């Protein structure tokens, strides 16, 4: 899919929620997974780049997404929202279950083209952020790192924060790094360019 205009990004809907591979859609549409810590702004990212207010439900309570949520975009592409990691109020067994579900999807889904790994630009990546990035690199899954909440930092400090994030991740410069803000609508075009390059 070389041209963005062939995709009507506003024609989007939630397709289904899945707990395991028996529930995944049975076709060959390309999929982009979205991964990140609870409350990093995954739902806001989805809503913003699709130009929709409440397609992905945002929540002030982290850990709301407990299944893989598949979003259909113009019958040409899917986003797959995976459960947010690193939320302390979820039991260890529940976290292990989520981890297994995410790992099964990421390592066995032929439709998967890339993962948008969301991190918070304001802070150094967490241990879980680093583990996720390392996991994706190990399995040779293309990664698009999107650093959210840029509006909370003065623009003059973005480069410094970007350097901190990249250093902690041991960022591979062949991957894409995007500074993003759903509030100020920064990084939308760059995100689409990176996504469409993979599908």
From Swiss-Prot:
Transmembrane segments: none
Entry binding sites for GTP: 36-43, 63-67, 81-84, 148-151, 180-182
UniProtKB keywords: Cell cycle, Cell division, GTP-binding, Magnesium, Metal-binding, Nucleotide-binding, Septation
Residue ranges of domain EngB-type G in the record: 28-199
CDD domains reported in the protein's UniProt record: YihA_EngB (cd01876)
Disulfide pattern: none
Residues annotated for Mg(2+) binding in this entry: 43, 65
One of the record's GO cellular component terms: cytosol
Pfam family, one: MMR_HSR1
GO molecular function, a single term: metal ion binding
GO biological process: division septum assembly
Named cofactor requirement(s): Mg(2+)
Known role: Necessary for normal cell division and for the maintenance of normal septation.
Entry's family note: Belongs to the TRAFAC class TrmE-Era-EngA-EngB-Septin-like GTPase superfamily. EngB GTPase family.
Protein name: Probable GTP-binding protein EngB
